[in-house]
């Protein structure tokens, strides 16, 4: 029998592994407004920077407040982990740049938020990443657009402004066939549309 998933409201408040502040035992998550952290010594610092040991190095890399947020968002979405960034366009950029480089291409849905179209057209193109567009009304259009340089499919769950539901399963099945990941912008339906089934599928 599978373990019952907590309600989203419970996960939002208690998700992740945070229970209380180790210094004060306060149950509310503190807002750490620091940029730097004190090391226990030179060996401790060296281990952190060499990534031999997990811990706080610099707030742009890791912050205890962000850590709690990321674990809770991952729990809400049913994902394995999460990275918080300052905007949706940053998230889209990170996702694409994680898998593609100059000379590669991404096959994207034609139904896209205007800001994403600008990102793809004016920014990623300058980095040598080609964006090919496929009409999602027929998922086979994604398969027709790929070649050996295709590094990802891209779509929006409920695209702005059309709100035509993206065929997630059909396109992800094509991606599995060719070992191409599907990057989804889930801005319009977070928590409601769970794109991952592990580690905690919604009942």
PLM features: residue spans?
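Buried hydrophobic positions in well-ordered alpha/beta secondary-structure cores of metabolic enzymes
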Residues: 25, 73, 91, 106, ...
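Conserved N-terminal alpha-helix of the aminotransferase class I/II PLP-enzyme fold
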Residues: 36, 41-90, 115-122
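Conserved PLP-anchoring active-site segment centered on the Schiff-base-forming lysine
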Residues: 98-116, 134-135
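Hydrophobic beta-strand scaffold residues
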Residues: 131, 182-183
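Short conserved active-site loop signatures built around small residues
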Residues: 2-31
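Conserved small/polar residues in nucleotide/adenosyl-binding loops
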Residues: 196-203
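Active-site core of PLP-dependent enzymes with the aminotransferase class I/II
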Residues: 158-181, 188-194
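PLP-dependent aminotransferase-class I/II
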Residues: 118-170
């Amino acid at each position: 029998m599978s373990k019952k998933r907590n309600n989203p409201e419970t996960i939002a408040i208690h998700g992740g592994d945070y229970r209380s502040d180790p210094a004060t035992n306060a149950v509310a998550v503190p807002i750490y407004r620091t940029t730097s952290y004190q090391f226990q010594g030179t060996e401790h610092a060296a281990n952190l920077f060499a990534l031999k040991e997990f811990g706080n190095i610099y707030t742009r890399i890791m912050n205890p407040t962000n850590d709690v947020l990321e674990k809770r968002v991952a729990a809400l979405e049913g994902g394995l982990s999460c990275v918080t960034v300052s905007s949706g366009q940053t998230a889209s950029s990170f996702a694409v740049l994680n898998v593609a480089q100059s000379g590669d291409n991404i096959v994207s849905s034609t139904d896209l938020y205007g800001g994403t179209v600008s990102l793809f057209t004016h920014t990623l193109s300058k980095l040598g990443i080609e964006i090919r567009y496929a009409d999602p009304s027929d998922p086979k259009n994604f398969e027709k657009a790929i070649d050996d340089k295709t590094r990802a499919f891209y779509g929006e769950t409920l695209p702005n402004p059309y709100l035509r539901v993206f065929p997630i399963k059909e396109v992800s099945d094509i991606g599995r066939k060719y070992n191409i990941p599907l990057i989804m912008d889930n801005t319009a339906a977070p928590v409601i549309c769970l794109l991952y089934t592990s580690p905690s599928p919604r009942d």
